[in-house]
Each structure stands twice: as structure tokens, then as C-alpha cells.
């Protein structure tokens, strides 16, 4: 997972009376982009007021540039989804002080950038994560999954892009938007790796789901928070405009110092009906003190290893009440650009397992399941298996309900194609289980093993998120053994909680409950 740290600038000139709350500096730890800001407006303003405010801000900017003979670009990205409205841009000190005083402005923060850290790349490790999802104990590499395989799901991978031509994606991956450069390629490998865990034919959880690349990181694994917000807004609006709500998922394997702007963008996507799977972070500290864990509503995922322990080696998984569930994230084999494969470790790899399982859940024919309740559903159907999860942290591990694991068995659907593409023959089944050739790890990504990762600042110093507090995660439940409802005859008997409508959005047992499962040999 990507988490960011850097150098902060002094904000002493931001002391205007009655101005919008400004993000506090973080004791010299942030890497701010000079003269770049993110502006959030109050939720109760109308769309017309938003447009008028942007015109006003542009006029203020133009007057200041003309008067002082300076060169600033002004408003860059803007967004308006539901009641979440704002913009980012490059402004002079005088202009941003004017903007902060405006009655419609709720929050202003400095844009920041950083570099990736806390994940490890190597070659030749076994792909154990899929097998763990469908078996009661670690060590089994057979992956049993329902044959719908996420065929109705649409997953937005907000990351460094996707190698959409990789044969493992079978034409199901497409480019959506690019907020970092003009090159629609994944030159950092991370996004393609995450996408492969979600939906590649050999390494993927949901082997038939559609994948949409939203690029917010450059070839050095860096990206401004304003690009994160713009990418989240684009994915939310794209899902709304194309009728994907109810089957749309966002994978967010990014993060860093706490940002109210990014947190609100994540929450807005979840409010819109998109399931958001977000990495908990790799600092071995409280996940709730940073972004994305500082956001409410979304599902925050920790990293477990192949022995069901919370990962505590290089880039140790974060912990705390804000971690909703654990998933495999250590030494995970998946796709990398150029048709190859490689292994990475981190909560970045854990979150895509949950995103893939959400795509399968979204593909259940006629279920009417609300993806907004998916995180609670996954937690309630999880296995209480994670050892030493950390203080005040759930021990729940993602499972899919096959082979006696506690969890739902899903239904059947057809493979999903990116919007505008016709279904092509021969894409209903995964290819050979052998990994593709060329298992080349990203250059320069082989840090010494078992080295302590840097911890995030103890005091992020951001303004509180005005739209809700992080909610506590599940407490350990040692008695939650799970497989008691698996029938020896090979059929499934649903658990007692199956028809609890208030907890799971009214999702009743569907007709296809006893459909056969497929077994994928790794």
C-alpha cells in the first residue's frame, strides 16, 4: 500500500478571522506542493451557488494574477457529487486568503505529495491467498469459488493504472481516467498488481469482473491528494451516469497523512452506493489516525500472512478499531505490466481480495443486495482466525463460504465486459493455471526483509472530519468457528443470520443456493 510522508511548510500567514478551517501542519512531516490547495464547500449550497462560487474564485484569481504579474494556473479539477462539492488549484497567497473567507467555503487544505513505502516485491513465492479464502485452515492452495466469478461487477482501481493489454485480463480491463499525466500506462506496476488480485484469470478473486483504471500515481509512485479526490469523484460519477450503482466497487490501495478532503471523497462514494475497499496502511500503528482509515463508512482492510497472523515484517499491517477485516496480503502473486507476474506484500494486496469478493457478491442474480451493507456482511460471515491482530482489533478473516468456511455461496452470471465492448468468445473460463512468463519484479523494489517500517506521525493534526466519526471494528469472537452449517452431503444449510433483513439489506436466500462450485487449482 502506498503511504506518504514528507516535509511541511510553515502556515503562519493563514490566520484570517472567520476563515474556513485550514489543515494544521504536522510537525515537519508533510510534503506540500507549493501554492496548491484543495477547497471543499459547504454541503447545503446549491449547484447554482457552486457554479457562481467557482466563477467568483476564478475572477479573484485573474485579478490577482494581473495585478501582481505572477503566473498561477488557478482552478484545476472540480467535483460535484451529491452534496460533495469542491475544487483544487494553484493560487497566490492573497487569492487563497480571499477564498478561505467566502461564506460557502467549509474547508481548505494544502495539496501534498509523497512516495510509496512499506511494500515488498520478490519473485517465486506461491499464490496462497485465493486458497485461503475458500478453506478453513491455511496451507490449501485449491481455490473454490462460485462460477459467476464476478461477471456483473465493475471495479474501479484507483492507483497507478492498469496494463489493460495483459492477457490475464482477457479484454475485461479498460482505461477510465487519468489525473496524473498523459500516459495511459502503468509504469509503477502497483495498479496492475492490485487489478490482477481483483480480477485476473489466474490470480484473481473475481475472474470475470470488469476493471476500470483510474490513474492518480505517476511512474515514481507519487500523486497529489487533489488527484486522489478527482479520481474518486470521477469513479463515483461514472458509476452513477452508467447505471453501475449496485454493482460498482472502488479499490483504494493508497493513503497517507490524514486528509479531510480525501476522507470525504471516499465517504461520498460509499454514500452513492459504491462499495469501497481500502487498505489499512503499513506502519504497524493505528489505522484510524491516517487516510483512508480516517474516513467513516468505507471498509478498511488489514494484511494477514499465510499462517493467519497479522503481518508484522517489512511494512507491518496497521491495526486498531478502524480495521474492519483482514485478508491475505503477504507474498501475493499477481499480474505486472508486460504480460508478467510478480509478488508484492502489503495491505495494498489485502484490499483487492475484498474488492474481488464484493464483485462476486454484486453478481448474484436477482438478489437486490445493497453493496452499502457489504462490509458488515463480510465481517459477520468471516472466520475468527487472525492471530495477534493488534490491540483493539478484530480477528476476522475474509472467507467466501466454500468448503465449509463460514460465508455466503454466490450465484451465477456472465462475464462482464468494459462499457462499449462486445463479449468475445472464449472468455467465460480462466486460461491455464500456470503463471504467465516473465516474473519480473518492479525495479528497485527489493528492500531487506524484516526491517521495521517507519511509523506515521503521532499527531496528524488535521481538522476533524465533519461528516462522521470512524466506527469501531468487530471485537474478537473466539467461538465463531464458522463451518457448523456445512452439510456432509455437500449441500449448504444457511446460517441463522441469513434472513436478518435489518443487518443485510433484506437479502434473502436465492433460488440458486445449491448451484455447483468450481475449483481452481493454483
From Swiss-Prot:
Top EC class for this record = hydrolase
Q: Write down the superkingdom of origin.
A: Eukaryota
Q: Biased composition, Pro residues: where in the chain? A: 432-459
Alphabetical UniProt keywords: Glycoprotein, Hydrolase, Protease, Secreted, Serine protease, Signal, Virulence, Zymogen
Renumbered residue ranges of the record's region Disordered: 384-515
Which residues bear sugar attachments? Answer: 251, 392, 403
The protein's job, in short, is:
Secreted subtilisin-like serine protease with keratinolytic activity that contributes to pathogenicity.
Question: By what name is this protein known?
Answer: Subtilisin-like protease 10
Which species?
Arthroderma benhamiae (strain ATCC MYA-4681 / CBS 112371) (Trichophyton mentagrophytes)
Amino acid at each position: 500500500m502506498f503511504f506518504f510522508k514528507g516535509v511541511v511548510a510553515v502556515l503562519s500567514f493563514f490566520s484570517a478571522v472567520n476563515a474556513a478551517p485550514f489543515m494544521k501542519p504536522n510537525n515537519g512531516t508533510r510534503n506540500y506542493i507549493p501554492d496548491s490547495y484543495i477547497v471543499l464547500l459547504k454541503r447545503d449550497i446549491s449547484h447554482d451557488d457552486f457554479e457562481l462560487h467557482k466563477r467568483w474564485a476564478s475572477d479573484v484569481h485573474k485579478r490577482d494574477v494581473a495585478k501582481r504579474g505572477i503566473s498561477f494556473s488557478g482552478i484545476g479539477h472540480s467535483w460535484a457529487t451529491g452534496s460533495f462539492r469542491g475544487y483544487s488549484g494553484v493560487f497566490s497567497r492573497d487569492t487563497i486568503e480571499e477564498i478561505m473567507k467566502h461564506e460557502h467555503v467549509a474547508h481548505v487544505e494544502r495539496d501534498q505529495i509523497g512516495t510509496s513505502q512499506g511494500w515488498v516485491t520478490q519473485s517465486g513465492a506461491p499464490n496462497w491467498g485465493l486458497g485461503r479464502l475458500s478453506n478453513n485452515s491455511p496451507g490449501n492452495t485449491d481455490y473454490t469459488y462460485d462460477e459467476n466469478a464476478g461477471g456483473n461487477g465493475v471495479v474501479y482501481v484507483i492507483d497507478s493504472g492498469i496494463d489493460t493489454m495483459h492477457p490475464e485480463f482477457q479484454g475485461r480491463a479498460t482505461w477510465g481516467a487519468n489525473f496524473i499525466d498523459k500516459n495511459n500506462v502503468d509504469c509503477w506496476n502497483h495498479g496492475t498488481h492490485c487489478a490482477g488480485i481483483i480480477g485476473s484469470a489466474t490470480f484473481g478473486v473475481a475472474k470475470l469482473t470488469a476493471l476500470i483504471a483510474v490513474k492518480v500515481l505517476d511512474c515514481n509512485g507519487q500523486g497529489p491528494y487533489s488527484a486522489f479526490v478527482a479520481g474518486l469523484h470521477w469513479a463515483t460519477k461514472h458509476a452513477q451516469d452508467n447505471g453501475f450503482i449496485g454493482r460498482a466497487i472502488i479499490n483504494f490501495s493508497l493513503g497517507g497523512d490524514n486528509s479531510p478532503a480525501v476522507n470525504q471523497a471516499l465517504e461520498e462514494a460509499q454514500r452513492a452506493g459504491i462499495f469501497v475497499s481500502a487498505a489499512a496502511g503499513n506502519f504497524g500503528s493505528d489505522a484510524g489516525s491516517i487516510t483512508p482509515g480516517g474516513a467513516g463508512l468505507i471498509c478498511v482492510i488489514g494484511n494477514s500472512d499465510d499462517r493467519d497472523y497479522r503481518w508484522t515484517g517489512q511494512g507491518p499491517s496497521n491495526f486498531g478499531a478502524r480495521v474492519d477485516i483482514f485478508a491475505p496480503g503477504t507474498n501475493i502473486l499477481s499480474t505486472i505490466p508486460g504480460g508478467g507476474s510478480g509478488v508484492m506484500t502489503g495491505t495494498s494486496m489485502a484490499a483487492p481480495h475484498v474488492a474481488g469478493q464484493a464483485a462476486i457478491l454484486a453478481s448474484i442474480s436477482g438478489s437486490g443486495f445493497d453493496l452499502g451493507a457489504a462490509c458488515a456482511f463480510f465481517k459477520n460471515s468471516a472466520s475468527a482466525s487472525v492471530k495477534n491482530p493488534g490491540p483493539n482489533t478484530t480477528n476476522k478473516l475474509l472467507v467466501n463460504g466454500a468448503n465449509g468456511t463460514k460465508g455466503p455461496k454466490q450465484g451465477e452470471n456472465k462475464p462482464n465486459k468494459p462499457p462499449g465492448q462486445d463479449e468475445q468468445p472464449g472468455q467465460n473460463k480462466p486460461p491455464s493455471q500456470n503463471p504467465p512468463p516473465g516474473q519480473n519484479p518492479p525495479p528497485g523494489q527489493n528492500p531487506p526483509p524484516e526491517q521495521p517500517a517507519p511509523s506515521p506521525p503521532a499527531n496528524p493534526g488535521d481538522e476533524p472530519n465533519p461528516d462522521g466519526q470512524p466506527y469501531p471494528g468487530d471485537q474478537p469472537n473466539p467461538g465463531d468457528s464458522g463451518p457448523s452449517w456445512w452439510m456432509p452431503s455437500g449441500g449448504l444449510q444457511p446460517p441463522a443470520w441469513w434472513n436478518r433483513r435489518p443487518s443485510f439489506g433484506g437479502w434473502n436466500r436465492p433460488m440458486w443456493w445449491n448451484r455447483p462450485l468450481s475449483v481452481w487449482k493454483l
